[in-house]
């Protein structure tokens, strides 16, 4: 008996250190990937991350299976094997099918899903007989919904050619979103004081999770053009209708997410700090109004202020969450050694507390860093796009993702009042997992579309450059916007852009867009001769230039004097030229 106890303690202690080490290494590699420039090194890191994911799943599930006997143990072992086989094979398949995908983002998604699989399995399979009977099918449902979501992620990029047309469907997205929320408000049964879900074939869906995607698409489409006062007011009214319906449904967590996404996307589109300040003021007024109008908001604020005075009733949930986080310490109690099921609705609303109790504070910190890595990665993609529709959608998805994490972790740690939202990709909940995977799947689709267009243009440009060099062709100075004062050298990006800026390309070209040191998502038209896609998707290129070393190396005056690039500015064509030079 003593030997068995010793072996159990040894296995648990070893497991928690190994789990933390594996997860920490995976997260560190995700951050190091920002500095990787060589394709071979990048592929090697991807493979290492896949192996780490498999090792994490094997080690964590073996620890749980060590204490789960009988049919439940066999069920857990089989489920673990299916999870490993599916995730690893799917990561390889995604790389093969979508060679230009952002695989580090996809790897992060799969690792977060793995943490969720382990946590949900532990809660379901190891506990009281009553708890196991109640939650026994949750790990299987979680795996099924995650698998379906990943399959959608695989399929979505095949429709990338249609994404550009969605910028004209803003009203349609808004109408669909408002209609879906209104129907649920009218027909959904009340659950925990809110009317936000309905059940089909044993699966409970929360439509507001999917409406988030329509909502971001609606805002991106409506704000991708010129943001006039009239348009801003119109968009604000439609966004407010979404929020009001959610408030009427008592889904205040989702209402808060919708409002913050609207505010940040409008701020990005307008570029005005006054918009952000006005939005914050409006949000403060709304928070006070909610506190005065809704009794359950008052209860949650009172719980947040001092849950331990109400520990026997309303404060029990958050008090148990605080106990769990503090009890776990730095390294955690070890899988199966905590009491996560003592927290009501732990698998959906308090997953971060359960993970911190058994896997430790260090593991949870790295978990948050991995979530932050996803946010930074998506934000960097948004900043790299010149296409406003691409930029706004990606930015909205990033804000939606990180703000939901802030709400759930902040609520569980008593940093802010509870909102009842899930931890994306980790908490139990089919709607949450499916909608998050769909939202991030569109982010991947936009990235693939951008990379393909950039690669297609660069291939065409290199071919033209080689042809110009072979023929020793002079620069084309016809219709020179500078009246011949400043001309590109033969074969330079500007020479190529100016020579081909005809009707087949659909708009003006900027020097900034075709700098060899910068990539721009500005290639979407079809060349009349070859059918290849390259040319601007939109003609509203920025006219405020940036100073980059060497950006004027390809320029010279017609009398042979070199052009230094000092005191530069841009004209309405977007071309750089010396300050004071007239057209």
What feature does the model see in each segment?
Residues 2-97, 113-118:
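Transmembrane alpha-helices
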Residues 14-21, 322, 434-442:
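Hydrophobic alpha-helical transmembrane segments
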Residues 61, 408-583:
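A juxtamembrane structural motif centered on a specific transmembrane helix
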Residues 72-127, 132-314, 353-411, 438, ...:
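Hydrophobic alpha-helical transmembrane segments of multi-pass inner membrane proteins, especially
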Residues 203-205, 210, 257, 335-336, ...:
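Short capping/connector residues at structural and topological boundaries
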Residues 217, 223, 320-334, 424, ...:
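P-loop potassium selectivity filter motif centered on the GYG triad
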Residues 251-256, 331-335, 345-348, 416-419, ...:
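Transmembrane helix boundary and interhelical junction motifs in multipass membrane proteins
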Residues 307-352, 362-363:
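TM-adjacent membrane-interface loops and short helices in multi-pass inner/ER membrane proteins
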């Amino acid at each position: 008996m003593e030997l068995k106890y010793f072996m159990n303690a040894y296995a648990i202690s070893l497991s928690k250190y190994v789990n933390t080490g594996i997860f920490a290494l995976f997260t560190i590699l995700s951050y190091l990937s920002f500095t990787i420039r060589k394709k071979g090194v990048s592929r090697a890191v991807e493979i290492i991350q896949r192996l780490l994911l498999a090792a994490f799943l094997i080690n964590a599930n073996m620890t749980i299976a060590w204490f789960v006997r009988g049919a439940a143990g066999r069920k857990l072992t089989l489920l673990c094997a299916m999870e490993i086989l599916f995730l690893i094979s799917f990561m390889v398949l995604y790389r093969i099918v979508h060679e230009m995908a952002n695989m580090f983002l996809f790897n992060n998604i799969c690792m977060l899903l793995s943490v969720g699989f382990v946590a949900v399995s532990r809660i379901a399979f190891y506990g009281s007989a009553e708890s196991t009977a109640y939650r026994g099918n949750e790990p299987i449902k979680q795996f099924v919904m995650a698998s379906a979501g990943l399959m959608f992620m695989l399929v979505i990029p095949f429709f990338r050619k249609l994404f550009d047309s969605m910028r004209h469907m803003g009203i349609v997205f808004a109408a669909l979103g408002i209609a879906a929320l209104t129907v649920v408000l009218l027909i959904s049964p009340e659950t925990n004081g809110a009317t936000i879900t309905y059940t089909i074939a044993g699966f409970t869906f929360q439509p507001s999770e999917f409406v988030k995607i329509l909502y971001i698409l609606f805002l991106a489409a409506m704000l991708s053009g010129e943001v006039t006062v009239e348009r801003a007011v119109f968009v604000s009214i439609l966004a407010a209708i979404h929020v009001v319906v959610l408030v009427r449904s008592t889904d205040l967590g989702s209402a808060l997410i919708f409002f913050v996404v609207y505010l940040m996307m409008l701020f990005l589109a307008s570029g005005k700090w006054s918009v952000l300040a006005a939005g914050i003021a409006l949000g403060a007024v709304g928070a006070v109004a909610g506190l005065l109008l809704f009794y359950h908001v008052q209860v949650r604020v009172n719980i947040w202020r001092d849950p331990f005075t109400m520990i026997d009733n309303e404060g029990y949930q958050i008090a148990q969450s605080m106990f769990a986080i503090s009890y776990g310490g730095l390294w955690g109690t070890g899988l199966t050694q905590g009491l996560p099921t003592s927290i009501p609705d732990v698998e959906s609303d308090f997953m971060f507390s359960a993970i911190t109790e058994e896997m430790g504070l260090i593991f949870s910190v790295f978990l948050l860093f991995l979530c932050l890595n996803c946010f930074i990665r998506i934000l960097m993609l948004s900043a790299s796009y010149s296409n406003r529709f691409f930029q706004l959608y990606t930015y909205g998805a990033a804000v939606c993702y990180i703000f939901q994490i802030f709400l759930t972790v902040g609520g569980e740690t008593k940093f802010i009042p509870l909102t009842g939202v899930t931890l994306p990709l980790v908490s139990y909940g089919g709607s949450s997992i499916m909608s998050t995977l769909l939202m991030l799947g569109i982010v991947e689709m936009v990235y693939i579309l951008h990379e393909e267009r950039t690669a297609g243009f660069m291939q065409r440009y290199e071919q033209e450059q080689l042809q110009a060099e072979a023929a020793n062709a002079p620069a084309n100075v016809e219709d020179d916007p500078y009246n011949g004062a400043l001309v590109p050298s033969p074969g330079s990006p500007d020479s190529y852009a100016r020579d081909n800026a005809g009707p087949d390309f659909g708009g003006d070209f900027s020097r900034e867009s075709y700098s060899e040191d910068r990539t721009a998502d500005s290639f979407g038209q079809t060349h009349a001769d070859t059918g290849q896609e390259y040319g601007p998707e939109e003609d509203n290129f920025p006219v405020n230039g940036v100073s980059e070393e060497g950006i004027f190396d390809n320029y010279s005056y017609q009398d042979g004097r070199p052009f230094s690039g000092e005191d530069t500015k841009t004209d309405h064509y977007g071309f750089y030229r010396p300050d004071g030079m007239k057209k």
